[in-house]
């Protein structure tokens, strides 16, 4: 009988739509040998070899004696050089589709056929998604929990048992170098419990150091006993016990002869795994009068000696991870510290196969998170998670129970084929009964938008580039520095901080985007992926210094290293964690839901006298005297608020000063304040002003990310200076200051489990996405959002997420309640003519200059007369416009490049305009010659390729202080002179998206204090609605200068 086949192609509405063939494959009988179109192949590197990557082009289900799946695959980017992968036995159940990337283990036959069956080979689905052994082991009993734990990482709270386990791991690992005698173990335990390393965790869990020490000491005799029984150290020449084996020879004995590594961090793109091996040991195995040495992973467990499938599975997975660094150990060791009993866990094929299948299933659900509707609308919805298990008892103690029920009720129950085990229906109902349909819809929409955004970022960059691209390729993008050798001594800063210095094997350190404070992954150039992670301390021409979590001193001296920027995933876990918290059944979350989702009106008290303490009135009155009228109104509104206030900080209105003054007043009234923003620099700008007024504050965050003048107030520096090692001292520090400052993503700090604030102030609130902005609001009774939704919105890269509303900030959302809004309209930055531009375009005339001095201010050019005299001698008819542009009394100039002409060019790196770049360069040279300081000039362009081109011109000029940057980088800042290059100039009607955003234009127009020069092609820019209005206003004011043909070539030198 002929086998029956069922074809599977990439669905026309799938996520890979743009990468699939323009028309479907025909039936296999008609076109079985045709070369599939390469449009199905995603933009990822494909290759053969040990770390092969194949793209699945076509899937055929074959029903013969046994069901099989035949995958047509290629390792060619062109879609040729086809191979066949046959899935047999239970591998047939693998969920896979055309366009998926796979890795194959096994042997390929001479006819280019792979066979993956019960007995041969492995298939790794999405191998570049590295999944931890813990997640896979937890997925054995409930795959849904593993998926949710990956998504809602910040919701997995620590526990006393987990902390004890971590500390015991630490003690054991230290003992591998110090010894396992009773006295040494006691000393290590004391050092661990009473040292600074775990103080935060003990504070968070409200533990007592003496109690913790007592619990830790219960384990110490077992550690000593294990060393006596199983180590071959000269101090432990006792009888060797047999390890218990989960399978194998009962006469086998095992003894540890050497500890090679602790917490060995391994990434395995070969098996799609990652993990930290507790201990890597050289082991001597005696079997039937024979002895042999092996390097094996040793997994430590502090809980009940269960020898459970989850525990054994982790060890089996570590045997696979170990193959990234050395030969297959074929087995691993599982040690229970409570009893001192150790098991040998063989890494047999059966266990490895089943665990990799679970890993594939987990990777499928973590990758295929979105679903395109089949109704022709191409609407994106959230995909279902693995099914719920029918075990109420297990679910009762699950840390993801709330998220499990929440996702089911808000997402899965909206689909037709949603199934819930009958016994779980009341559980889901109980966990979510406090939520209304509006609440569930808010959660569903924001979960979808955050997922769309995370996926759009992952498609452009990601961790996989570290192993899929060479260091030279990554260097071109500024994301890596390769060919490095380690130099000098490794300095130990703390238990998990080691200062390393690297230099280029030949030549100086290349130009790079890597900067101080950036997170990096250190790998070997040819082997040893992800040896260590850490942060850059300093980048110089001759060397680069890093603080890493591991010492690299034991590695070969001639090993070449590469440092890769570890790009964040966009903070998806923070977004989802805050969304989950908002849905909690708690009074804090309920209040925020009412204000944010239900739009309950904010409440205010009527009289300040009920708020201001009598002894603070004179101080507050003194502070208020230095403010203008709108700023005073803002102070009053905040003090009267019971829920929230929005302060609209229009350009140049002294937003930072206003926040600083607000903190001073709240401080004087005895209120506690949580001060936050999205960026460290925004937080520190406020603190630098506060510092001058002797307002005490505690700054949370990694020291390397903080402004140098703020670092002395950081938790890290204070703990070092005071040598804080007790919980009482730490608690005193955390409660010592009424003002605590951190970023919005720093609120997972332990201090927030014990402290609540009277007010939370969020700066840059109009630029922060709603879920991130939510984070600090959970920890205060009232909040103040400061921003301006007429300036830059939250950055959203996904067009679909933007259309759904992800660029709406919490500031913008709450602005509908106008009684909570105060506008700062008096500005101190721009002269009147520059201010008039945004006043007409955006602010409807509400902006006003603070004084005549501000209104009439012009750029200071001490050498302008000398320069103008020089120009008169060299002047030609073609360059007369230059004098007008230099004239300080002309604050606004638009240089129309239409007649030159100055057409844009589009290359691989992006869009640029070399003529505009040249004009910007020459204009800047003239301003410098006229006496303008380089630091007073700023250059703005919407496209990075244009910035790169302009910067290349400036490399030949000693004017490195002239800042060249995007609009986004200039938000909140100003310069005396701003030159804007609009770049776009074409005849085919191309527009692009960057210049369509009037908020971005508003920021560009409001950065200049005294002189604003814009360059662009009027006919092209007129096609943008917002720019058309600008050009119309400029024409009315006679501020447009038509540059003559070849103007860029007639510059006076």
From Swiss-Prot:
Cross-referenced CDD domains: DEXXQc_DNA2, DNA2_N-like, SF1_C_Upf1
Name of protein: DNA replication ATP-dependent helicase/nuclease DNA2
Subcellular localization(s) per the UniProt record: Nucleus; Mitochondrion
UniProt organism field: Xenopus laevis
Necessary cofactors: [4Fe-4S] cluster
GO terms of molecular function: 4 iron, 4 sulfur cluster binding; 5'-3' DNA helicase activity; 5'-flap endonuclease activity; ATP binding; ATP hydrolysis activity; DNA binding; metal ion binding; nuclease activity
EC number(s) given by UniProt: 3.1.-.-, 3.6.4.12
One Pfam assignment: AAA_11
Catalysed reaction equations from the record: ATP + H2O = ADP + phosphate + H(+)
Alphabetized InterPro entries for the sequence: Dna2/JHS1_DEXXQ-box (IPR026851), DNA2/NAM7-like (IPR045055), DNA2/NAM7-like_C (IPR041679), DNA2/NAM7_AAA_11 (IPR041677), DNA2_Rift (IPR048459), DNA_replication_fac_Dna2_N (IPR014808), P-loop_NTPase (IPR027417), PDDEXK-like_dom_sf (IPR011604)
Comment on bound cofactor: Binds 1 [4Fe-4S] cluster.
Protein task: Key enzyme involved in DNA replication and DNA repair in nucleus and mitochondrion. Involved in Okazaki fragments processing by cleaving long flaps that escape fen1: flaps that are longer than 27 nucleotides are coated by replication protein A complex (RPA), leading to recruit dna2 which cleaves the flap until it is too short to bind RPA and becomes a substrate for FEN1. Also involved in 5'-end resection of DNA during double-strand break (DSB) repair by mediating the cleavage of 5'-ssDNA, while the 3'-ssDNA cleavage is prevented by the presence of RPA.
Keywords: 4Fe-4S, ATP-binding, DNA damage, DNA repair, DNA replication, DNA-binding, Endonuclease, Helicase, Hydrolase, Iron, Iron-sulfur, Metal-binding, Mitochondrion, Multifunctional enzyme, Nuclease, Nucleotide-binding, Nucleus
Positions of region (Nuclease activity): 86-521
SUPFAM superfamilies: P-loop containing nucleoside triphosphate hydrolases
Gene3D superfamilies named in the record: 3.90.320.10, P-loop containing nucleotide triphosphate hydrolases (3.40.50.300)
Gene Ontology cellular component list: cytoplasm; mitochondrion; nucleus
Protein family (similarity comment): Belongs to the DNA2/NAM7 helicase family.
Any one GO biological process: replication fork reversal
Region feature (Helicase activity): 522-1053
Superkingdom assignment: Eukaryota
Binding site for [4Fe-4S] cluster: 142, 395, 398, 404
Encoding gene, per UniProt annotation: dna2
Binding residue positions for ATP: 649-656
Taxon lineage: Eukaryota, Metazoa, Chordata, Craniata, Vertebrata
């Amino acid at each position: 009988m002929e086998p029956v086949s069922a074809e599977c192609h990439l669905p026309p509405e799938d996520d890979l739509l743009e990468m699939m063939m323009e028309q479907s494959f025909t039936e296999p009988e008609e076109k079985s040998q045709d070369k599939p179109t390469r449009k199905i192949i995603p933009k990822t590197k494909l290759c053969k070899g040990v770390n092969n990557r194949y793209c699945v082009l076509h899937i055929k289900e074959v029903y013969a004696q046994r069901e099989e799946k035949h995958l047509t695959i290629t390792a060619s980017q062109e879609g040729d050089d086809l191979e066949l992968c046959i899935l047999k036995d239970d591998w047939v159940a693998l969920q896979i589709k055309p366009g998926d990337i796979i890795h194959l283990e096994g042997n390929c036959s001479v006819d280019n056929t792979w066979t993956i069956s019960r007995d041969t080979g492995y298939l790794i689905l999405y191998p570049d998604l590295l999944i931890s052994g813990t997640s896979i082991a937890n997925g054995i009993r409930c795959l849904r929990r593993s998926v949710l734990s990956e998504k809602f990482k910040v919701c997995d709270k620590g526990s006393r048992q987990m902390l004890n386990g971590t500390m015991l791991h630490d003690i054991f690992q230290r003992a591998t170098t110090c010894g396992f005698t009773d006295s040494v173990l006691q000393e290590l335990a004391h050092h661990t419990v009473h040292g600074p390393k775990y103080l935060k965790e003990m504070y968070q869990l409200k533990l007592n150091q003496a109690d913790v020490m007592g619990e830790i000491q219960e384990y110490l005799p077992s550690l000593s006993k294990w060393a006596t029984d199983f180590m071959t150290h000269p101090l432990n020449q006792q009888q060797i016990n047999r390890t218990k084996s989960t399978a194998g020879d009962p006469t086998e004995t095992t003894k540890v002869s050497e500890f090679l590594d602790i917490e060995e961090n391994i990434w395995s793109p070969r098996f799609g795994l990652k993990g930290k091996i507790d201990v890597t040991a050289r082991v001597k195995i005696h079997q039937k009068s024979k002895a042999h040495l092996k390097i094996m992973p040793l997994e430590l467990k502090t809980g009940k000696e269960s020898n459970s499938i989850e525990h054994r599975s982790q060890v089996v997975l570590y045997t696979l991870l170990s193959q990234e660094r050395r030969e297959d150990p074929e087995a691993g060791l599982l040690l229970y510290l409570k009893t001192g009993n150790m098991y040998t866990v063989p890494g047999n094929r059966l266990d490895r196969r089943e665990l990799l299948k679970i890993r594939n299933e987990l990777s499928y659900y973590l990758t295929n998170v979105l679903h395109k509707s089949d109704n022709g609308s191409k609407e994106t919805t959230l995909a279902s998670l693995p099914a719920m298990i029918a075990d109420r008892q297990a679910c009762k103690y699950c840390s993801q129970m709330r998220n499990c029920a929440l996702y089911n009720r808000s997402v899965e129950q909206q689909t037709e084929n949603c199934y819930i085990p009958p016994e779980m229906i009341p559980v889901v109902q109980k966990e979510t009964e406090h939520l209304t349909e509006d609440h569930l819809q808010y959660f569903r929409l924001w979960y979808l938008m955050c997922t769309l955004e995370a996926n759009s970022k992952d498609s452009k960059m990601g961790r996989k580039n570290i192993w899929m691209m060479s260091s030279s390729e990554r260097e071109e993008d500024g994301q890596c520095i390769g060919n490095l050798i380690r130099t000098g001594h490794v300095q130990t800063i703390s238990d998990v901080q080691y200062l390393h210095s690297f230099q280029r094997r030949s030549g100086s350190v290349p130009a790079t985007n890597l900067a101080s404070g950036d997170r990096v992954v250190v790998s070997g150039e040819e082997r040893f992926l992800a040896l260590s992670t850490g942060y850059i301390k300093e980048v110089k021409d001759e060397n680069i210094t890093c603080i890493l979590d591991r010492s690299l001193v034991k590695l070969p001296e001639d090993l070449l290293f590469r440092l890769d920027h570890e790009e964040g995933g966009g903070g998806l876990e923070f977004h989802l964690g805050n969304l989950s918290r908002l849905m909690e059944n708690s009074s804090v979350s309920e209040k925020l839901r009412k204000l944010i989702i239900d739009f309950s009106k904010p409440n205010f008290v009527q009289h300040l006298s009920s708020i201001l303490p009598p002894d603070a009135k004179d101080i507050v009155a003194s502070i208020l005297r230095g403010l203008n009228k709108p700023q005073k109104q803002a102070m009053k509104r905040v003090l009267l608020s019971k829920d929230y206030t929005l302060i609209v900080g229009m350009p140049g209105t002294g937003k930072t000063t206003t926040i600083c003054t607000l903190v001073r007043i709240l401080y004087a009234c005895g209120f506690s304040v949580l001060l936050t923003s999205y960026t460290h620099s925004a937080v520190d700008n406020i603190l630098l002003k506060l510092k001058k007024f002797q307002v005490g504050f505690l700054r949370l965050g990694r020291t390397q990310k903080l402004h140098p003048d703020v670092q002395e107030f950081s938790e890290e520096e204070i703990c070092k200076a005071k040598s804080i090692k007790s919980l009482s001292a730490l608690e005193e520090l955390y409660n010592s200051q009424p003002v605590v400052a951190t970023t919005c993503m720093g609120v997972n700090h332990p201090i927030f489990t014990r402290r609540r604030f009277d007010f939370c102030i969020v700066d840059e609130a109009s630029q922060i996405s709603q879920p991130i902005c939510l984070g600090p609001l959970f920890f205060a009774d009232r909040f103040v959002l400061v921003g301006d939704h007429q300036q830059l919105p939250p950055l959203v890269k996904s067009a679909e997420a933007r259309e759904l509303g992800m660029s709406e900030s919490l500031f913008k959302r709450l602005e509908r309640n106008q009684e909570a809004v105060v506008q700062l309209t008096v500005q101190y930055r721009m002269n009147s003519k520059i201010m008039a531009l945004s006043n007409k375009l955006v602010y409807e005339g509400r902006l006003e200059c603070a004084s005549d001095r501000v209104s009439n201010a012009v750029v200071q050019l001490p050498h302008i007369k000398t320069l103008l005299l020089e120009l008169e001698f060299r002047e030609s008819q073609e360059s007369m416009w230059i004098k007008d542009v230099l004239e300080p009394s002309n604050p606004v100039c638009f240089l129309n490049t239409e007649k030159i002409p100055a057409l844009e060019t589009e290359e691989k790196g992006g869009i640029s305009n070399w003529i505009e770049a040249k004009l910007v360069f020459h204009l800047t040279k003239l301003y410098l010659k006229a006496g303008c300081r380089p630091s007073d000039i700023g250059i703005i362009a919407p496209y990075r390729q244009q910035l790169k081109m302009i910067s290349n011109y400036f490399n030949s000029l000693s004017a490195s202080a002239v800042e060249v940057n995007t609009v986004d980088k200039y938000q909140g800042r100003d310069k005396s002179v701003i030159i804007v290059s609009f770049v776009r100039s074409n005849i085919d009607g191309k527009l692009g998206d960057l210049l369509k955003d009037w908020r971005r234009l508003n920021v560009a127009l409001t950065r200049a204090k005294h002189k604003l020069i814009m360059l662009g092609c009027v006919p092209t820019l007129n096609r943008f609605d917002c720019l058309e209005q600008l050009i119309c206003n400029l024409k009315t004011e006679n501020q447009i200068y038509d540059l003559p043909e070849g103007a860029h070539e007639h510059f006076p030198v």
